[in-house]
Amino acid sequence: MPNIKFRASRRTLTSHAGLSIIGQCFEIAGVDSIDSRFPTTLGMRTSDVIKSYLGLLCLGMSDYDAVENFRRDKPFQQLLTLQKVPSAATLRQRLEKLAANDLQARTATWSTTLLSLIEAPITAETTHVCLDIDTFVMDNSNSKKEGVSRTYQKVDGYTPIAAYLGNEGWCLGLELRPGKQHTMKESNAFLERVLPRAQCLTKQPILLREDSGFDSQAHLALLEQQRQVFADEGRRLDYVVKWNPRGSATADRDTWLAVAADYWEELRPGKRQALWTQTVSIHDDNKTEYVVQRVMRLVERTADRDGQLLLEPDYELEGWWTSLDEAPEAVIKRYQAHATHEQFHSEIKTDLDLERLPSGKFATNDLILHLAQLAYNILRLMGQLGMTGELSPVRHPAKRRRLRTVLQELVHRAALVIHKARQIIPRLRAGHRTHDGVEHLAKPPALSTRNAMLTVNRRHSIHKQFQATRDRQICRAWRVERHDKTGRQHRSARWVLAITGLRKPTCTGRMIKKCSLAVIGKVSAPASRIQVIVTTSFFLWLSVWRFCQRPCSTKSFIFLPSTSFFSA
C-alpha cells in the first residue's frame, strides 16, 4: 500500500469546475439585470443572493445551510462573478423578502432568454415539437409548511405544475401549488403563460399533451381558441388530452358496446379491441360552441394473458381529445410518449434535491421552484451540448443525459484555478474525456460570436459628450459597416459600437425618450467576456441581450465609443 500523506496547498483549487460554465449561463440569461429592478442601498446585491442560491441548486443542494461551506470558497465566488457570498440567515431573509415582492414574475424570462441565445437543440417527435404539461407530487409529510395538504397520492405535500418542451425536456414553467389543489384549477392561466415561451423557442408545429386531469370543457375551448390564434400567425398548434370518462362510462356500457360493434379486432385469444373516432360539441363559459373530435378505444378481455378464462368479460374504455387528423393508432402512440415527462419530475425532486422544500413559507418555496427552473435548464443544456454524440462519456449511448450524470461528469470536476491576464482559467487534468466536453461547452456557437447586440435602458440619461449630429452618426456607422464587410479597421473600428434601430426618437437635451435602442457592432473579444461598467459620469445601462450576425444599417444611428464603458 502506498504511503499517502495529506498536505495543504496555497493554490486555488476547486472541486466544482463546472461552475465556470454555469456562471456564463447566468450572464447570458440576464440574472444581473435583477439589480436594477430590486436595488439595495445597503448589504449585498440582489443578483449575488440569487446567483448564490442558483449555484447551490446547480450543485444539487437546496437547503440554506449549504451556502456556509462556500462563504470562503474563492472559486465559487469568482466563477459565478459574485461580490459576496451570503450567509445562511441572509440567504433565507432575502429570498423571503424577494418572494414577497413577486420576484417570480421576473424570473420567467431567464430560461427562454438562455435557450434562445444559446440556440438550444429542440428535437421534434415526428412532425411536432411536444409540449407536455402535468402536475406531480412533492412529499413534505410531517411538516407544518404553508400550503402542505393531502395530495392525490394520499401523502401530505405540494402538487406543482410543470411544462416541458421537446424530447430534451426543456422546462418552460414550474409553479408551486398547494397539495389539495385540483389539477385543472388555474391551469388555463398557466397555459397562456407557457405557450408564448414555446413560440419564442421553436417555429415548428407544437403538440400539447396532457392527462385526464385537464379534461374540462373550458380548457378544451381555450385550446381551440389558441389554435385559432396560432393559425392567424401562420403557426400550427395541436393537442392530445386524455379523456376522463367519470361515471358515465360504466353506466352507458351497452351504448358503447353497440357503437364498437363495427370496429372489433382480435389482438390475441381472449382479447379484442375497437378503435373509432367521434365528434363532440362542447361549450365555453360564454356558451360558444366548439366541435372537437375524440378517439375512443374499448378493450374486451375474456381471458388473461396466461390463458385463464374469466367468469365474465372485463371492459376497459379510454378516450383522447385531439385535433390531429391522424389514425386512432397514431394518436394513441403519440400520447403514450407523454409518460417520458415523469423522468423530468424525478430529476427535479431527486437530482436538484427539491423533494422537501427548504422554507416554511409558500411564496418563498414558489420562488425557489422558479429558480430551480433555470438551474434545471442549465444542467440540461450542459448535458446536451457536452455529453452527447462524440463528447459522450464511456457509457451507453443516449439522446439525453440525466441531471445526476451531468453533475458527476461535468460539474463536480476538480480543477486548478489560475488567474492570468484578467482571465480565470480552470485547469483540468489533461487527457480526461470530460476535458473535451467542458472545453466544448466553454465555446458554444452563441458564446464565440464576435457580434454583440445590446439593449439600452431608455429611462437613464445620456451624457452630452456622447451625442452626435446625424452626419457624424452616418459616418461613424459606415465605418462599422465597412469593417463588418471587409474586416479592415478604419480609425480603430475594432473598438466601436453603434446604436441602431431608433423608432421615432424624441431628443430633449440629455434625455432620449420614446425610443427603442439596440447596440450592434464589432468587439475584439468573445461576447461572453464583455463586462458592463457603470460609472458616475456616464449613466447608461447596457445588458447583453442577443447575439447576431447581421451587418449594421445606416438608417438612424447614435455613435458611442465602446472603450468608455466596456472592458473585454
Q: Where are the model-predicted features located?
A:
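An anionic, glycine-rich sequence signature occurring as long contiguous blocks
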Residues: 2-4, 8-11, 232-350, 440-451, ...
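Charged/polar low-complexity intrinsically disordered segments
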Residues: 64, 89, 467, 473, ...
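Conserved nucleotidyltransferase catalytic core and NTase-mimicking acidic/glycine-rich helix/loop elements
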Residues: 378-411
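Short amphipathic alpha-helical "interface-anchor" segments enriched in bulky aromatics
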Residues: 67, 328-367, 371, 375-382
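Low-acidity, Ser/Thr- and Arg-rich intrinsically disordered low-complexity segments
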Residues: 488-495, 503-510, 515-516, 524, ...
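Dynamic "connector" segments at or just before major functional cores
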Residues: 1-156, 162-182, 187-201, 229, ...
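Short, conserved catalytic/metal-binding motifs centered on acidic residues
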Residues: 52-53, 67, 85-87, 91, ...
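Domain-level cores of phosphate- or acyl-group-handling catalytic modules
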Residues: 181-248
